[in-house]
A protein has these predicted regions:
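Conserved glycine-bearing catalytic or ligand-binding loops at nucleotide- and phosphate-handling centers
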Residues: 58-75
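Conserved, well-ordered active-site substructure
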Residues: 14
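Thiamine diphosphate
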Residues: 4-8, 17-50, 73-185
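Short, well-structured alpha-helical patches and their helix-loop capping segments
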Residues: 40, 56-59
Length: 185
């Protein structure tokens, strides 16, 4: 991710403007502390959404495999990017497999007025937060995004009626996926 930042002008001029069918696989997405301050993968969601590039963030190997195959099909035109964190698969998130959908509710409670939203490995923390809130009789749902940008109308419809929408991500604030969602809501 941090090396992609250094080539952002090429992403704009050599890929996005021409709409070329390039697939970017972005390793070390999110916070990667031990790699050093200048190697954090917290900018790519913001800058790739600025050029209108569809962006995906699988939460497990099954989703990564599925979306790699989907985005390599002939009918999938234009540039696309898949970002994934450093390290191995999160065991908890691996249990959810792959639905092939742009988003999934991983936790639902009847009468929930709040939804906690995230993507990739951060969903593990979201699920833990939902469990703790449920222990305190606070009903909430957990929504996992796989396709981060652009949002589908169906996803916006799924969250627009919640009284409270909380978004967590390892990304800079300005231009983040959470900021895009706030704008849409």
């Amino acid at each position: 991710s941090s090396f992609l930042q250094r080539g952002f002008d090429q992403v704009i001029h050599d890929i996005a403007i021409g709409g070329f069918p390039v697939r970017l696989l972005i390793d070390r997405a999110g916070i990667v502390g031990e790699d050093g301050e200048t190697h954090q993968g917290v900018y790519d969601p913001a800058f790739l959404s600025q050029v209108g590039m569809p962006l995906y963030a699988p939460s497990n190997y099954a989703e990564l495999t599925y979306w790699l195959h989907e985005l390599l099909k002939d009918g999938c035109r234009g540039p696309r990017a898949i970002r994934y964190p450093r390290g191995g698969e999160n065991a908890r998130l691996a249990q959810y497999g792959c639905s092939g959908q742009d988003y999934d509710f991983l936790h639902r409670t009847e009468g929930a007025q709040a939804v906690l939203i995230s993507y990739a490995d951060e969903m593990d923390d979201i699920l833990t937060a939902c469990e703790k809130l449920t222990e305190h009789r606070i009903n909430c749902d957990a929504l996992k995004l796989v396709k981060l940008f652009p949002f589908t109308e169906k996803m916006i419809e799924a969250v627009k009626d919640y009284k409270i929408v909380l978004f967590a991500e390892e990304c800079v604030e300005w231009g983040s996926i959470g900021e895009h969602l706030a704008y849409c809501l």
